[in-house]
């Protein structure tokens, strides 16, 4: 009886294997590279970073209490996180093919919708906290 072959998805990456401080250092470097790439290549990410540069100090200077300020800051940072995911989805789809395809469009539209919801969340959180 033949030995079952592992599924390609189960294969371990040849890039794995670093542990301890080396792994942490490499992960940090890759994260910074991702932030640089997003800032360099994604207009929406740059706009949202500059929005955060304005809103984060505004949250700290607001009359809201500590919890309110924390929620305001978290809502702004959530936009950055969601935009990073959206940009990663778009890059992966473009890597597969630049051809128009309904599933590619669907994935990109869904990612964009996630960013929109995160932005609406900022407006809602800020309105609720500042009106309290």
Locate predicted features.
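Membrane-interface alpha-helices at helix entry/exit sites of multi-pass transporters
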Residues: 103-109
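Alpha-helical membrane segments and immediately flanking helix-loop junctions
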Residues: 92
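Hydrophobic alpha-helical transmembrane segments
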Residues: 1-88, 96, 100, 114-132
